[in-house]
Amino acid sequence: MVAISFLEAEIERHGNQEAYLLRELRSGGEAGFDEKKLLQGFFGYFERLKPRLVSFNGRGFDLPVLKYRAMVHGVSVSWLYGAGDNWNSSQSRYSTDWHCDLLDVLSDYVASARVSLHEVSAVLDLPGKFGISGSQVAELVDEGRIEDVRHYCETDLLTT
């Protein structure tokens, strides 16, 4: 793992509607940080702020990978399991207050076909991918192009 990117937004509520004001978009740490340091920074940030996590397939891929890698390095994520209650927590699939996985929401929690972030972007006339796909990340890392990977992650995040 060479990059963990995040977007911080302020939620403005207007009745039943929410609007999001972008505050910050970046990759955590620095390009030279090792995996353990990246994970400590990411999970420490979330433990302090307890923000709503918004992802695209984050519940099925990103968050499990982050948790497994945290286990390898002895980075505690216990707070993830204690926040909220049984029905409204970061582990509750159907509550979007702590974690809104857009893939789950758009597919009616896999009751209908799953679509890619690229397909959703095309339908909404959003730019989507900018010249790099996920299949190229390992090659970029091997070539030492960590900044390119960080920018790719940030672009994916902005699209989400």
Residue ranges of predicted features:
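Short, basic/hydrophobic alpha-helical segments
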Residues: 35-49
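Short, flexible loop segments at the rims of nucleotide/cofactor-binding pockets, characterized by
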Residues: 28-34
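Metal-dependent phosphoesterase core characteristic of DEDDh/y 3'-5' exonuclease domains
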Residues: 2-12, 17-28, 48-151, 155-159
